[in-house]
Amino acid sequence: MPTLSEYKALLAADEVAPAILAALKEDSRIGAGKLLAAYQRRQAHQAAEEVALRYRSRYERQLWGTYEYVAGLDEVGRGPLAGPVVTAAVILPHHFQWPVNDSKQLTAHERNVLYPHILTEAIAVGIGVADNRTIDRENIYHATELAMAQAVDHLRVAPECLLVDAMHVPVDLPQKRLIKGDANSISIAAASIVAKVIRDRLMMMYDKIYPGYDFKDNMGYGTKAHLAGLAAHGVTPIHRRSFGPVRDRLRS
């Protein structure tokens, strides 16, 4: 009879022989029952992830019947008082299996784990950035559109169709706008993760350049600590001067 450690090693394999599971089921040791229960929970979780991933790839699968290269686009940073809007365009291979989801539903650790896998396995990734000056000049919505067009232009493989999270991209390509696209499309979800990780890292860098605003934690959003820093230290070169609290500080 295998030891519990041996069973544990066998259950960690990619494929477990039915005979192993049958033997474990007949094993009267309490530890054996716990190992089997843990294995079954993992299998159920994996099956649920596969179903969810298939659901979130339904728009891609529809479009892949017509287009080989479908790019998902998303943005991060429309609401903050400081820093840029960052956009990403991602073309995923048809066999992509990583459990990407709306970046807001993932922890920072989960995003950082998925980020390199997206960069490695994607057919192409393009980044667009609209800094605070562009935002002040164009308005936040148009600046985001321009950054999205920039992200498409930076793809090393030309997309044939776009999936976009509730916006229109000013490029001459067929595009489908989805409400809550980052939760309903794996391509948009992947783009949201890439854009979020890049923007967060930028804001952490800015936190070192402009201490006193807590950029590393608030990412430029108008938190209590950020507003206190704005009152105490004034407006930095990365603040959006057209946004209310910043504009008010300039007038005071």
Curated annotation (Swiss-Prot):
Residues that coordinate or bind a divalent metal cation: 74-75, 165
Family: Belongs to the RNase HII family.
GO cellular component terms given for this protein: cytoplasm; ribonuclease H2 complex
GO biological process, one term: mismatch repair
Catalytic activity: Endonucleolytic cleavage to 5'-phosphomonoester
Protein's cellular compartments: Cytoplasm
UniProt-recorded name of the protein: Ribonuclease HII
EC assignment: 3.1.26.4
CDD domains: RNase_HII_bacteria_HII_like (cd07182)
Signal peptide location: none
Source species: Lacticaseibacillus paracasei (strain ATCC 334 / BCRC 17002 / CCUG 31169 / CIP 107868 / KCTC 3260 / NRRL B-441) (Lactobacillus paracasei)
Pfam families: RNase_HII
